[in-house]
Amino acid sequence: MKYVASAFMRKMLLVAALVLLGAEISAGQWLKVPTPGIPRTPDGRADLNAPAPRTADGKPTIAGLWRPTARLIENITRGMKPGETVPFQPWAEALFKTRVANNAKDDPTSNCIVGGVPRSDFVPYPFKIIETPGLVTILYEAVHSFRQIFTDGRKLPQDPNPAWFGYSVGRWEGDAFVVESSGFNDNVWLDNAGRPAGEALRVTERFRRIDFGHIDIDITIDDPKTYTRPWNVTERLLYIPDTDIIEYMCTENNRYFRIVPDAAPPGAPVGKR
């Protein structure tokens, strides 16, 4: 698939350039601190196949440090069932093809903007899920960002202020943590290839903890202005023991517009690296 390759190569060339320029984004910098209270095998390793933990009231917990498989970040359709296709509205398919032809040069994340929902579920960086009464918070290492999911019984607002992460409310349905989100701005990208979404977008995520070390997220994308019907993808999260998220300051090392000057907005630094 040409669009996947070109978007991927653009990202990889950018990463390589940042490394050569002294960008300090390295897995070797991650902290090494034993995670207390988790099941372990006889050799001391985290037992990722142990039963899923539960809170005192018997509900599963999704708290912990996780990373996605990242198989959907370049191409969200990898999470669809075989034979399914994205049900584009004609204008949205045309916009997507334009972004493919431009090698996704207008990707908001290239300007250190957060990926939004559900794209941030796919990025190849860790994120920490924290559960507190009335609120689940997700701390993303990528772009040093966070997301709030309100679990105090409130409804989604009727006229929210448009935002990259939207507005999210959550509830438990059996063993699934169900998150509904709306209130997005009109420049959301669903993946690195540039599949679009807009202010009519509504995302439903169902988090199911399979065992101690794995969570499956079933994601429904419903945007009637952009797609002709709702459609679904699935991603898997992997538990990361004995470490933590680290600081990620995108703007300190952002040289994207010097590498790809024709994507730069007015006033951005371009030219020599």
Stretches found by the model and what they are:
Residues 24-273:
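PEST-like low-complexity, intrinsically disordered acidic/proline/serine-rich tracts
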Residues 6-7:
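Intrinsic, low-complexity polybasic segments
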Residues 11-24:
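Bacterial N-terminal signal peptides
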